[in-house]
UniProtKB/Swiss-Prot annotation:
Residues 354-439 form the KH-like domain. The gene is der. Associates with the 50S ribosomal subunit. The lineage of its organism: Bacteria, Bacillati, Cyanobacteriota, Cyanophyceae, Synechococcales. GTP 2 binds at residues 184-191, 231-235, 296-299. One of its GO terms (molecular function) is GTP binding. This is GTPase Der.
Length: 455
């Protein structure tokens, strides 16, 4: 179903992300004592009673400073208010009312979104009542004392949130979205790509490395199906990142790869494939995720009729972990081929989830054996591949039964995988091949049993 949105609004370091984690029972939002950790608007699933909703966390609002990302953070907050059913405005009860809180109240009055005022860091009921009183002057309604860390008052606050949500019968059914993670090194254009796809300023774009720190979820409809796009923090070598918000953002990025159906690995056309790109490619293959390689900033290169072919060959020679992944040359700046990402990603997901019957698998293996026999030992012992069967999908995984797995070296194993790909496809998806030793008569009996069951 289409879920209503609850926006979290407030100045820096009042505990917005802590409250998001409390409301959503997760630790997805990055919490750190450094102000300005959250920059883009990030979405999580919230639940209370029999209702489901989206909680959108926004960056800390500052109105007396236009340095760095602060104007963009204000724009992100305004976009969140446009789609929200209610805005939860968070203030710091221990610090008391500030001029920044008053500026935020003025900002909210220019939007039509209903508001609920939460006074955070009220660690006891007596404290809460005393602290909340001065916030009536903001004109945002009754102040609700809460403790985001300990959970005090959050149940009552959520009861109030539900009164602003549309009735359940106004929420329609929705298909489970495809999870697509947009990953890459810092500053390769991931956020620009996300904005080009969505047609709006969904993520803050800046030449400063590390602009995106959270993983940013965006829901969108493409190819007649729902997608959830995750723009991740730029992933660098861990020893180059200090312990802090960016460190946690990188960990979130690795988790985004793990929970994705398909990864879009963004490569900078100007830089080519770096050592870190290779590490990311290896991570995607290791986690068994479908993948599309997107070469961004294609508009910035001088080209002739052979440039794309030559560059793809060069890039693939270095991205050997992902030789099965389709490659697309795009420009987030001009929008060139951006929409084609979805068609390739949808095909990769389809192949990633695909299953093939045992009989079809063995037709391919039989042909592979006819072209190239298994290796023979110096003593004259012949390797034998009895049969194969698909045992799993996501990624497609096959068990191959042989007389002795040790006789099948890496070269022949790669040959068999290539033949499976040529015969069965699986473009955009990694494969897993498991080689198992078995006596010939047992293998023949098992294969006959499988075929009789399917017949």
């Amino acid at each position: 179903m289409t879920r209503p949105v609850v926006a979290i609004i407030g100045r820096p370091n009042v505990g917005k992300s802590t409250l998001v984690n409390r409301l959503c029972r997760s630790r997805e939002a990055i919490v750190h004592d450094q102000p300005g950790v959250t920059r883009d608007r990030t979405y999580q699933d919230g639940y209370w009673g029999d209702r489901e909703f989206k909680v959108v966390d926004t960056g800390g609002l500052v109105f007396d400073d236009d340095s760095e990302f602060l104007p963009e953070i204000r724009e992100q907050a305004a976009l969140a208010l446009e789609e929200a059913s209610v805005a939860l405005v968070i203030v710091d009860g221990q610090q008391g009312l500030t001029a920044a809180d008053e500026s935020i109240a003025e900002f909210l009055r220019s939007h039509r979104c209903p508001t609920l005022l939460a006074v955070n860091k009220c660690e006891s009921p007596e404290q809460g009542l005393a602290m909340a009183g001065e916030f009536w002057s903001l004109g945002l309604g009754e102040p609700h004392p809460i403790s985001a860390i300990h959970g005090a008052g959050t149940g009552e606050l959520l009861d109030q949130v539900l009164t602003f949500l549309p009735p359940k019968d106004q929420e329609g059914d929705e298909e489970e979205p495809i999870q697509m993670a947009i990953i890459g090194r810092p500053n390769v254009g991931k956020s620009s790509l996300l904005n080009a796809i969505c047609g709006e300023q969904r993520a803050i774009v800046s030449p400063i490395r590390g602009t995106t720190r959270d993983t940013i979820d965006t829901s969108i409809i493409r190819e007649n199906r729902p997608w959830r796009l995750v723009d991740t923090a730029g992933i660098r070598r861990r020893r180059s990142v200090n312990y802090g918000p960016e460190f946690f953002g990188i960990n979130r990025s690795f988790k985004a790869i793990e929970r994705s159906d398909v990864c879009v690995l963004v490569i900078d056309a100007l830089d080519g494939v770096t050592e870190q790109d290779q590490r990311l490619a290896g991570r995607i293959e290791e986690d068994g995720r479908a993948c599309v390689v997107v070469v961004n900033k294609w508009d910035a290169l001088e080209k002739d009729s052979h440039t794309m072919t030559a560059m793809e060959k060069e890039l693939r020679s270095k991205l050997y972990f992902l030789d099965w992944a389709p490659m697309l040359f795009t420009s987030a700046l001009t929008g060139q081929r951006v929409e084609s990402i979805f068609a390739l990603a949808a095909l990769a997901v389809e192949q990633h989830r695909r299953r093939v019957s045992t009989s079809v698998v063995n037709e391919v293996l039989k042909e592979a054996l006819s072209w190239r026999s298994p290796p023979t030992t110096r003593g004259g012992r012949q390797g034998k591949l009895y049969y194969g069967t698909q045992v799993a999908s996501r990624p497609p995984s096959f068990t191959l039964f042989v007389n002795d797995p040790k006789m099948f070296g890496e070269t022949y194993r790669r040959y068999v995988e290539r033949q499976i790909r040529e015969g069965l496809g699986f473009d955009g998806s990694p494969l897993r091949l498991f080689w198992r030793g078995k006596q010939q008569r047992d293998a023949e009996r098992d294969l006959a049993r499988q075929q009789s069951r399917k017949g």
